[in-house]
Amino acid sequence: MKTNIIILLISLVFTFQLNAQTLNKEIAIEGETPYLLGKIDKSGLENENYTSWFTKNLKEYQPNQSVITEISTELKTYTIKLFMGTWCGDSKKEVPRFYKVLEACDYPMEQLTVVAVSRKPNMYKQSPQHEEAGLNIHRVPTIIFYKDNKEVNRIVEHPIKSFEEDIQNIIEKNDYKSNYQIVTAVDNILKKKGTKGLNRKTKKLLKTYEGKVTSMFELNTYGRILYGTDRIEEAIAVFTLNTKLFPNEPRSYMSLANTLGVSGQKEKAIVVLEKAINLHPENDDLKENLEMIKTN
């Protein structure tokens, strides 16, 4: 009996040490800026490599106290997941402000999960344990609010008004629309109907979002996320949609063609680039891209 208790205690200590080791893991490569990766907490952001921006932006932000008073009680009934990058300018600006709002609300930090993601091409906006899997994390920071283990809403990249006002909308009316609504719409279609469903919905999406999407990078970044997680067919479908939404943007065609090329669809890639060159005959990047595809 005593032996079993000792073994159990050793196992618990080992588990605790393992968890402690994986929290606030820093990746430090010679010649590169260090960054946090995986689950982190506030103490990790107060580390010497991050405190210059975290502490400064935390102190400078002054939440609207009247809104804080209105949201603080109800906010405690939600759990929150926050995905960020310590390498990301938006995360450096917005995450300290979000912490300031949570602290002003006396929010229980054990209900907050913070995950730092990578910017490396083979792990783009992913974490080692893939806490982001299936959550459509295409921009950071992304803050997801849960009630009874179900997603209620999210704030993407930056608040529409302010964190406290956006949170108030989410917990009171919940007619809140975060940034990058076209990505949300496309992701929902892919999850429910796949690429065939996206193809069927293309005309409707173009009619709904034409002129409302700020740049080709809204869908382009999302396509990169899909490609990086081996959802190749879906990435190609998204890049194809992007060429229709931004026909005057040569880079939209290059993203599609390069993805087709690396996935063994060389002839289709050539067709895409030749069409783009007909539309943009003066663009040397398209011509170079076509030559590269043809010779590989």
Per-region residue spans from a language model:
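Non-catalytic, surface beta->alpha helical segment in thiol-disulfide oxidoreductase systems
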Residues: R139, I144-V183
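Register position in tetratricopeptide repeats
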Residues: G228, V262, M292-N296
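Thioredoxin-like thiol-disulfide oxidoreductase module
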Residues: Q111-F145, F163-I171
